[in-house]
């Protein structure tokens, strides 16, 4: 898709539905999967928030933070992938509250027994279910979407089976042909639909920045 057409396509993707929950992102949280779908890191990079509908949600993420080592040295701590499920039915804002993670001892404790909180707009705790996402794949590059689907089918602590069935077949992401001016190959259509999905979730500022970037890209 040419860049100008891409920008126009995305501009038309603004949701007609009024979203009711704002998920405030943290620069210490690497969001990997949202509600069974792999996160588009390029689209959400630098975003301060994403908009969600009211109802149950599930995040897969890693905590990434620079910690201190002996001798005034530092290293980047990356937690194991975590799964957290929660409900935003009566909540308008969700904020991460991470525990203190400043050194190797605190990082080791977090690895063994991760704990964190989600707070609403009044800084009140939101009921959550938190678990570690055990990776079954031996591939060098982990497909967190597939791993999350397996997790959600296994009746674990933070499993939400409805998000496993949603991702069982990528064809469920494809909309009617009438939404597109032309019919591209199915793989390209799926790429567009995924991009459309994440564009709709991004906050207005992130949408604006992405459209500016898209306009500057050379035509394919």
Curated annotation (Swiss-Prot):
Keywords associated with the record: Signal
Signal peptide per UniProt: 1-20
Pfam families the UniProt entry points to: DUF2057 (PF09829)
Protein family per UniProt: Belongs to the UPF0319 family.
NCBIfam families assigned to the protein according to its UniProt record, in alphabetical order: CrliSynInhib (NF047712), PRK03641.1 (NF002967)
UniProt-recorded name of the protein: UPF0319 protein YccT
Lineage: Bacteria, Pseudomonadati, Pseudomonadota, Gammaproteobacteria, Enterobacterales
């Amino acid at each position: 898709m040419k860049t100008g057409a891409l920008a126009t396509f995305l501009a038309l993707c603004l949701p007609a539905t009024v979203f009711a929950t704002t998920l405030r992102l943290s620069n210490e949280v690497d969001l990997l999967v949202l509600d069974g779908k792999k996160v588009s890191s390029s689209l959400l990079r630098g975003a301060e928030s994403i908009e969600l509908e009211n109802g149950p949600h599930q995040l897969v993420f890693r905590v990434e933070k620079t910690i201190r080592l002996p001798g005034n040295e530092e290293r980047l701590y990356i937690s194991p992938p975590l799964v957290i499920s929660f409900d935003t039915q009566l909540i308008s804002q969700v904020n991460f509250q991470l525990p203190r993670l400043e050194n190797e001892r605190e990082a080791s404790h977090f690895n063994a027994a991760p704990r964190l909180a989600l707070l609403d707009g009044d800084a009140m705790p939101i009921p959550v279910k938190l678990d570690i996402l055990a990776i079954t794949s031996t591939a060098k590059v982990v497909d967190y979407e597939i791993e999350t689907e397996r997790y959600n089918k296994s009746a674990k602590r933070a499993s939400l089976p409805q998000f496993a069935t949603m991702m069982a077949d990528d064809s469920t992401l494809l909309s009617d042909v009438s939404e597109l001016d032309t019919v591209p190959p199915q793989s390209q259509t799926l790429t567009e639909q995924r991009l459309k999905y994440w564009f709709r979730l991004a906050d207005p500022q992130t949408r604006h920045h992405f459209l500016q970037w898209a306009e500057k890209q050379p035509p394919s």
